[in-house]
Amino acid sequence: STPLYSSAASDVYKRQKIGYPENWRDYAALTVDRTDYYGNVRRASEFESRRRIAQIGMPIDRGEWEMTPPTVNAYYNASMNDMNFPAGVLLPPLFDPKMDAAPNYGNTGGTIGHELTHGFDDEGRQFDGDGNLKDWWSKKVGAEFEKRASCLVKQYDGYSPVKENDKPLYVKGKLTLGENLADLGGVKLAYAAFKEARKGQPDAPLNGFTEDQQFFLGFAQGWCQNARPQMLVVRVKTDPHSPAEFRVNGPVVNVKEFASAFQCKPAAKMVKTDKNRCEIW
């Protein structure tokens, strides 16, 4: 971790939006008719367009949310330099206050770390702490970042989740770079936070798994899915996110603590040597 990264990250941390906004949007002027689906969509679109147009020339509302509270998602907004975690993403089976700390750190902690890292990925790094499009890194730091990031591009270029016309269809490393950077940064930040929280406390195994193993299992389980091949083809060609399995295996293969947690042998598929491991920050 560099001082540059740490101080800037603390600025983002101060601008968290968690659960729900302080000010609720007034929908009194929007007509909703349960018998008119098309009309509802059209009127809602018009309502939103008018609301946004009315913002032109007005002071920036840094308290505005881009997601509604029930949304099961999270985001980092570079132009606002803030993170948003709606209530929907903070509920079971993702975050569960009844669960042990380890899987919660792996799952929700990984999400928080992911969004924080977006402030320093290939796009987020182009915005300064006030949300202005400004190159605030030195040329030396920028060049080193590009060099390290190319390691991830090469790694993900080698992943193929599906075939098209009987030929392997490979993930696009450059298209997915920002999200892959955030996934890697996310799991590393979450693991560091987890170990800091558990410092000085004895390991608490559960169902035969150590705490470190529980952490990585929690990180992985959030990405369980069953996708049709046709959908995978579309996703690989257009989605800036990697397919779910590589959002797990892609990051952790670069985390040496993962290999240690599961006592992986040096020649195992999920192990990289120190020389080949992608280290960004």
Where are these regions (language model features)?
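Single conserved hydrophobic/aromatic residue that forms the stacking wall/gate
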Residues: 1-9, 13
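Intrinsically disordered, low-complexity linker/terminal regions across diverse proteins
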Residues: 10-281
